């Protein structure tokens, strides 16, 4: 089977790390062992520097909304061109913690950046490059934030007010409904239920890929 790019998406506290581990388990059960891992923003030395600037700013100066968008896309294209595409070309599968859908939801939804502008920027920077499968872990923002707070100190994005995350979730759900490559998983269930749902979704998708 040709190598694929699989992405885990969702709000803070949705359980992306656990989901990633579950996806990897299923891939290995299907004989897929050459797997590269990425995270966004970040994933390369340059992109990690941009991640730190995005998260913390410099000497109290935080990026404006438009600067935030451009920093995210700079980090993303660096990761895609230097890590993801080369990995896929050599036959490895790539499992990513976030990708472009995050920007479309957080900046296009949460921040209120013009959605046509966001789509245009995506197409200009990434061309036709898209994940083969995206698992969107959906849960009420208040639940995710409670989980995030329980983990410890919150970053700049995690400290946003609840309405920001409600707008972000609404955009996530809107985009997921429009794209057959995005599978929505109810992440408000118990850990065992979420894990079982992810295993089922990924296994069914792999069977479809094998039969294609």
UniProtKB/Swiss-Prot annotation:
Catalytic activity: dTMP + ATP = dTDP + ADP
GO terms for cellular component: cytosol
EC supergroup of this enzyme: transferase
Binding positions (ATP): 10-17
Single GO term (MF): dTMP kinase activity
GO biological process: dTDP biosynthetic process; dTTP biosynthetic process; dUDP biosynthetic process
Membrane-spanning parts: none
Keyword Nuclease: no
InterPro entries found in the cross-reference section: P-loop_NTPase, Thymidylate_kin-like_dom, Thymidylate_kin_CS, Thymidylate_kinase
Alphabetically ordered keywords of this record: ATP-binding, Kinase, Nucleotide biosynthesis, Nucleotide-binding, Transferase
EC annotation from Swiss-Prot or TrEMBL: 2.7.4.9
Entry superkingdom: Bacteria
Its biological purpose: Phosphorylation of dTMP to form dTDP in both de novo and salvage pathways of dTTP synthesis.
Protein family per UniProt: Belongs to the thymidylate kinase family.
PANTHER family in the record: THYMIDYLATE KINASE (PTHR10344), UMP-CMP KINASE 2, MITOCHONDRIAL (PTHR10344:SF4)
Name of the protein this chain belongs to: Thymidylate kinase
Organism for this UniProt entry: Serratia proteamaculans (strain 568)
């Amino acid at each position: 089977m040709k190598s694929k790019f699989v992405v885990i998406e969702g709000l803070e506290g949705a359980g992306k790390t656990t989901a990633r581990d579950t996806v990897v388990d299923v891939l290995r059960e299907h004989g897929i062992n050459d797997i590269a891992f990425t995270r966004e923003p970040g994933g390369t030395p340059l992109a990690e520097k941009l991640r730190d600037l995005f998260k913390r700013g410099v000497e109290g100066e935080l990026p404006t909304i438009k600067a935030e968008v451009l920093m995210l896309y700079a980090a993303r294209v660096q990761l895609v061109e230097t890590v993801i595409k080369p990995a896929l070309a050599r036959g490895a599968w790539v499992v990513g913690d976030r990708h472009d859908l995050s920007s479309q939801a957080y900046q296009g939804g949460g921040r209120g950046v013009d959605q046509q502008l966001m789509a245009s920027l995506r197409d200009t920077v990434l061309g036709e490059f898209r994940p083969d499968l995206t698992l969107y872990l959906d849960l009420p923002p208040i639940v995710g934030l409670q989980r995030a707070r329980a983990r410890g100190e919150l970053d700049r994005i995690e400290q946003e007010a609840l309405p920001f995350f409600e707008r972000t979730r609404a955009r996530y759900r809107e985009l997921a409904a429009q794209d057959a490559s995005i599978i929505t998983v109810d992440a408000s269930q118990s850990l065992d239920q979420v894990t079982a749902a992810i295993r089922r979704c990924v296994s069914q998708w792999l069977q479809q890929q094998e039969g294609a």
